[in-house]
């Protein structure tokens, strides 16, 4: 049974009527451009064919009623006419409540709704299950009530909900790619202007995500530390963000910076340049150059930003040993565990799968990987 059929069935069972519409919003993987988003830089993600699906219907009152199919049909009901505050128990409900509250703050004119939510974006793997949920809820209300909100506005609304209501600091990339993703394309995003450029992906190329299943310890505290170090470097150069520092200027005076701060800044500044080059390489179908840029990105994350861990480094090496210069591989996401992303010809996927299964557990304390073969997918919309 598809996610759409599943949510429609539960809607019928729980609410004794048919849903009006079903919408979806995808998760994402970032091909290159790591820890650049909060430095006003560039990122190159694609939406993936794992998504949050919501079947929904209008109500004739001012209640929002939500059922979480993935949490044993837990239910949340709240009023649009009372202050919207965090749920006393359900963490998932806060994402829904936050999106609704921030839509209200945008003066969006909408009434009550019944929602049934289900998703298959792996949680805790750095594939943006939360952004997928936020954009899906916004898209559901936008579609039900024909709200005059663009994809960029839905993405910003989701980011605000996560930052201010849920209390998790995040950049704009995850919500933006979920809202604006384009089938068979990556999206080059300027995180300062929010301008985007669709970048075609070569045909017959697989987007492979491998979860190391190494739990992402330290990620919150280390993320905040990295962010502070980047801000310190920007202050040193007298600019708003590291995006504004030319590589030539940085390399001419990097010795005057605190050595650790200099390493962090070097990653961000070089990663921005790599991301722009990668968009051009991908559009030209130059997988050899794309592979080199992804390799440089991983080395920079390992040595300058210091956010990889040995099992992740080994996993990257194992994949690279199979694909050579026919594709690229690097860690993706916040760091300290999580996933790697690999681009490769479809015909190499099974060889990579077999080699990783044979070699990786010896370097991970016996942990086995989880393997996802994805396609670059369309952003949020009707399902």
Curated annotation (Swiss-Prot):
It comes from Yersinia pestis. GO terms for cellular component: cytosol. It comes from the Bacteria. The keyword Glycosyltransferase does not apply. The record marks 28 as: Transition state stabilizer. Pathway: Carbohydrate metabolism; galactose metabolism. This is Galactokinase. Belongs to the GHMP kinase family. GalK subfamily. InterPro entries: Galactokinase, Galactokinase_bac, Galactokinase_CS, GalKase_N, GHMP_kinase_C_dom, GHMP_kinase_C_sf, GHMP_kinase_N_dom, GHMP_knse_ATP-bd_CS. The keyword Kinase applies. GO terms for molecular function: ATP binding; galactokinase activity; magnesium ion binding. ATP binds at residues 124-130.
């Amino acid at each position: 049974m598809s996610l759409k059929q599943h949510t429609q069935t539960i809607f019928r069972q729980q609410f004794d009527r048919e849903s009006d519409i079903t919408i979806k919003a995808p998760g994402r993987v970032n091909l290159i451009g790591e820890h650049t988003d909060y430095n006003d830089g560039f990122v190159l993600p694609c939406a993936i064919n794992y998504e949050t699906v919501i079947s929904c219907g209008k109500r004739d009152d001012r209640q929002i009623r939500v059922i979480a199919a993935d949490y044993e049909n837990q239910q949340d009901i709240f009023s649009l006419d009372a202050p919207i505050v965090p749920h006393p128990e359900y963490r998932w409900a806060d994402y829904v409540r936050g999106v609704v509250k921030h839509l209200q703050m945008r003066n969006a004119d909408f009434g009550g709704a019944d929602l049934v939510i289900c998703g298959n974006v792996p949680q805790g793997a750095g594939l943006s299950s939360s952004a997928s949920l936020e954009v899906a809820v916004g898209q559901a209300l936008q579609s039900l009530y024909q709200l005059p909100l663009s994809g960029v506005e839905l993405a910003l609304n989701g980011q605000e909900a996560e930052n201010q209501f849920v209390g998790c600091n995040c950049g704009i990339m995850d919500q933006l790619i979920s809202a604006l993703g384009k089938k068979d394309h990556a999206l080059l995003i300027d995180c300062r202007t929010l301008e985007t450029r669709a970048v075609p992906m070569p045909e017959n190329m697989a987007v492979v995500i491998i979860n190391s299943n190494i739990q992402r310890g330290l990620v919150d505290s280390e993320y905040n530390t990295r962010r502070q170090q980047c801000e310190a470097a920007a202050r040193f150069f007298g600019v708003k963000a590291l995006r504004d520092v030319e590589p030539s200027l940085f390399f001419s005076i990097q010795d005057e910076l605190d050595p650790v701060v200099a390493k962090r800044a070097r990653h961000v500044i070089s990663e921005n340049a790599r991301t722009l080059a990668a968009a051009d390489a991908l559009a030209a179908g130059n997988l050899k150059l794309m592979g080199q840029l992804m390799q440089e990105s991983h080395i920079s994350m390992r040595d300058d930003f210091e956010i990889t861990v040995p099992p992740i480094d080994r996993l990257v090496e194992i994949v690279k040993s199979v694909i050579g210069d026919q594709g690229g591989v690097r860690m993706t996401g916040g760091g300290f565990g999580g996933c790697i992303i690999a681009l490769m010809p479809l015909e190499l996927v099974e060889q990579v799968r077999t080699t990783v299964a044979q070699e990786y557990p010896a370097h991970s304390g016996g942990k086995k990987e989880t393997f996802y073969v994805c396609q670059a997918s369309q952003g949020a919309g009707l399902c």
